[in-house]
């Protein structure tokens, strides 16, 4: 015999949990199925375990989608301030780290517990270790639009909400399930790729792996954007906030330009030093401005020569200027989904209502969160998209 829930949500991550709680709050029944052993697994890992749950400077211009204006409605109707108010209601201590980024003081578990408590409060049924299969549409029945199997048991529902996320962090249960459902029902899927992800070295740059663990502030630029933030050298390539941000705008084969001294000008600085301390060695001057290990590596590789700064030729000064302020780096690629924070691409937002997250072609089928072709900047933007898309989905169902 079939079981029934008015609203079935697949995925117990940020978007799925929040949508279920919001549905319950609006008087609607909701059931969540997830194949994992715990709810909110990705939330627990986020922000170094402290969950950067939103950003005070949310704006639609910091999201990427092939449908440029898609995010505007949801972000306006459920804002960062709405979510911050909920966090405050639960007495969760938090702080601003930088650039509007809000983190939990005690840990990401506070957010997961809050979402779990909201689901409990509003009677949401959560079933874990659940494999969903055989999703089908049911014709000519407004109360039963879909049927599916969960661990071989048939369930029916009026509304089916896909909150299965993207392909990033496969170790936490990521799968293409949401994309497969979209395609099954005739929706277009923008090819997914890893986003907010470190770059890897080409063979010619691998000597830089000796700097693994070294970080510095940089300005990183490509044809589309510039970000000024911290960069980290790793064994595999380049990481850190500046690199993760630019990865959203990078295309394979494209070069990025790195200014390793964004708050200073090496030519002006050396001109001043040649006036005041002409006998200083170049290594000494550079080691005061840049990580010493980086300067030593440049010397080892013959990219610079240690000499008295008074003797620096015009050509060597120009080469040094390019090395520091205009390092043209062509990534070999990215580290891929294993370390990517999120997935770019996904269900085509041209085929989704921006007001309700319902598929325009399929009544009762909704997509929320990362499964959609929406990706935000690093810094709480993607969590806010989860909250906002989930909230307007619940509103849309309650109003229909």
Regions found by a protein language model. Give the residues of each.
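N-terminal Rossmann-like FAD-binding beta1-loop-alpha1 element of flavoenzymes
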Residues: 5-32, 393-398
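Glycine-rich FAD pyrophosphate-binding loop
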Residues: 24-48
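A glycine-rich dinucleotide-binding beta-alpha-beta segment and adjacent secondary-structure elements
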Residues: 128, 296-375
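An anion/pyrophosphate-binding glycine-rich loop and adjacent beta-alpha core
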Residues: 38-39, 44-45, 54-60, 93, ...
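Glycine-rich active-site loop/strand segments that organize a redox cofactor
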Residues: 48-96
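A conserved short coil-to-beta-strand element within the FAD-binding core of flavoproteins
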Residues: 128-143
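Core beta-strand elements of the Rossmann-like FAD/NAD(P) dinucleotide-binding domain
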Residues: 3-5, 150-159, 227-228
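Short hydrophobic core segments
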Residues: 8-10, 33, 132, 155-171, ...
């Amino acid at each position: 015999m079939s079981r029934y829930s008015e609203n079935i949500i697949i995925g117990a991550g940020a978007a799925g949990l929040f949508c279920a709680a919001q549905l319950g709050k609006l008087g609607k029944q909701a059931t969540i199925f997830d194949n994992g052993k715990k709810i909110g697994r990705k939330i627990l890992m986020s922000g170094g375990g402290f969950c950067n749950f939103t950003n005070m400077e949310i704006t639609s211009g910091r999201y990427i989608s092939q449908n440029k204006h898609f995010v505007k409605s949801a972000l306006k109707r459920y804002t960062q301030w709405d979510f911050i108010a909920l966090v405050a209601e639960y007495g969760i201590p938090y702080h601003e780290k930088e650039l509007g980024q809000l983190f939990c003081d005690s840990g990401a578990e506070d957010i997961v517990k809050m979402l779990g408590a909201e689901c409990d409060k509003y009677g949401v049924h959560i079933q874990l270790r659940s494999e969903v299969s055989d999703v089908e549409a049911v014709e000519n029945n407004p109360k039963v639009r879909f049927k599916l199997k969960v661990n071989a048991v048939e369930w029916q529902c009026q509304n089916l909400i896909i909150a299965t996320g993207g392909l990033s962090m496969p170790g936490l249960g990521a799968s293409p399930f949401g994309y497969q459902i979209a395609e099954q029902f005739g929706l277009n899927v923008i090819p997914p790729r890893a986003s907010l992800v470190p770059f890897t070295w080409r063979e010619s740059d691998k000597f830089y792996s000796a700097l693994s663990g070294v970080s510095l502030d940089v300005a990183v630029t490509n044809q589309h954007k510039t970000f000024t933030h911290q960069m980290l050298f790793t064994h595999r390539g380049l990481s850190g906030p500046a690199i993760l941000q630019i990865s959203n705008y990078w295309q394979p084969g494209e070069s990025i330009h790195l200014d390793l001294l964004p708050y200073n000008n090496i030519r002006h600085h050396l001109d001043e030093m040649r006036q005041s301390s002409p006998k200083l060695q170049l290594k000494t001057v550079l080691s005061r401005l840049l990580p010493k290990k980086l300067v030593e590596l440049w010397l080892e590789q013959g990219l610079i020569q240690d000499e008295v700064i008074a003797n620096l030729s015009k050509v060597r000064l120009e080469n040094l200027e390019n090395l520091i302020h205009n390092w043209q780096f062509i990534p070999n690629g990215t580290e891929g989904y294993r370390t990517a924070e999120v997935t770019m691409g996904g269900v085509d937002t041209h085929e989704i209502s921006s007001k309700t997250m319902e598929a325009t072609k399929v009544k009762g089928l909704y997509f929320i969160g990362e499964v959609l072709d929406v990706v935000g900047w690093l810094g709480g933007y993607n969590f806010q998209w989860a909250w906002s898309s989930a909230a307007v989905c619940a509103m849309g169902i309650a109003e229909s």
